[in-house]
Amino acid sequence: VRDHNGPCLEQFWDGWGAHLDFTRDGDRAWWQAGLQRQVLDIGIDVGWNDNNEYEIWGERATCHGFGQALPMARAHALQPLLMTRATFDQQANNKPDERVYTITRGGPPGLQRYAQTWSGDNSTSWHTMRWNQRMALTMSLSGLFNTGHDIGGFDGPAPDAEMLIRWTQACCLVP
């Protein structure tokens, strides 16, 4: 993904980085080769795409668009879908006789064909646990039938024993 200065640099957790452009054959092939070499070849059978919401907000940011430049403002949902499909396809090519399991945080329309998603980085609280259950049911009604959450929360203090037990029990019932 580029802007007028070259690759679009965005703030990630530990520094600046750039997103791959999955509308470009070379970027997609690079991703799949890395997935094969660094994950599948060492025996890990699950693909997990994280931090793939493509939060690129520069007005001049564009992607390759399969040969016709496309403003990123119109491709925010497309990129995570294509990333997830590339992950799914590489897993399927690696073990064609086995069922593919992929999880992805970016949750665009069409995702259910390739992966499950989860609610993202949630907080350790009773409120969040209740909210996540509502979110899972709503996502399921919207066609994302396989969803999940960070049990016990991702951010905040460690859950006490009761909260962790209740959260685990609740997530056993998530669609």
Name each model-derived stretch:
Residues V1-P175:
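Catalytic-domain carbohydrate-binding cleft regions of carbohydrate-active enzymes
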